[in-house]
Amino acid sequence: MNSVCLLYTIYPQKENVCSVCKQKKNAPQKKPCPPPCKYCQTSPMATKRKVYITLSESATKIVDLLPSNKGRQSLVLGLIEAYKLIDLCDGTIDIYPAQTKDLTTYHDDEFVKHLMGPRTFLDKNFNKIDKAETDLTNVVIEENDLDEKYGLTFDCYPFPSLDLYVQLTAASSINAARKIVQQVKETNDQIIAVNWYGGRHHCHKSHAAGFCYVNDVVLSINILRKNLGSVFYLDLDLHHGDGVENAFKFSKKVATCSIHRYDIGFYPGTGSLKSSRENTYNIPTEKGLNDSSMLWIIKEIVAPLISNFGPRAIVIQCGCDGLALDTHKEWNMTIKGYRDSIDWILSHFSEIPIMLLGGGGYSHTETAKCWTYLTGSVLGVSDIDTWDILPEHKNLDAYEKDGFRFWTDHNSGPSKMKDHNSVEYLNDIKTHLLSL
């Protein structure tokens, strides 16, 4: 009995040919749809998930130095290790400094040269690893005539070990992408690479921006694109993923989709609906976006876009500065809400390798909880919803205000913030984007 491609029964196509298997609508298939056409009855489905996670204590100490998120990486890694989630992974991904040639696969040569250049005063007065916990508030920043040209001012000022930070942050996502490429060639299982060190989506080709000194996202997508084929990038950060969008705005092999807060004066000020075009999709939201609205967007807008594009890999930036408890207080998302949306994608595109990256998140303990919870969910840990007293570990004191508990009255549900994203507003976005 011949099967037919079922893609059309779920998501309308612009043409009478399946965007994935290239066969005519409802016609008997001459051959099965290749992955990722999960809607074809004869498509091979992944029966198992393999999860790999980036891990490096030395990289953690260096990433802890990022001025906008001092000490955050230690909280994230510490909580993941406290719940023994590393032991449940199929393997870890090493992080060793990226070489200049890796960085210049996207970034401008002179920009990279300036990032890697010596900053004698800063580095002389700060041991690169052993004193990562030192307070840098009173450190006098070296002035350099080129800093302003390359965006190293204001929210991206130079800090000790900047060169090593750039190399390790880039390497975390580069190596995660390489792990995916390697594993895809060796197994039919779904491959998930988790990298909470990465997700610096604002950095541009020739200048730093928005706390982002290197665009590890772009560097990793380029590896996936060159080795596997088309890539779909989904950005869940509160802020528009402008750096990644700009990198691929003329690419036919990379589609970008950013769900973000958009308003006058809200950083970075880009990402309007009207700026969307084929393979560049912006979903600007109003204040108060909650779990149900986010999941609706994922199901009704993002999923059709992914299916129509037919990617060979998916990259998700999981910035969680949209949490109700984040200092921005612009969205009303919960930890479980982020999990529900991300898990829906992982489950419904289970034959596609997926990379999960970090990003924003400025309530550091809640960010650590969110990414630990997401890691546990990806691994299929059954008791994550009932986690209570936090396991003993070296960063436990950071959670004193929470009563040393994972779930509290504050993070187990949304706040009273109103969701200003009406059904009509979201449907207008859906209609516009699916018509491109």
Show where each model-derived region lies.
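A general "terminal functional-core" signal
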Residues: C37, S43-T54, F126-L436
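Cys/His/Pro-rich metal-binding microdomains
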Residues: S19, K38
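Cationic, histidine-enriched alpha-helical/coil surfaces that engage anionic ligands
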Residues: I93-T153
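Cys/His-enriched microdomains
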Residues: S3, N16, P35
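N-terminal low-complexity, Ser/Thr- and acidic-residue-enriched intrinsically disordered segments
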Residues: A46-E110
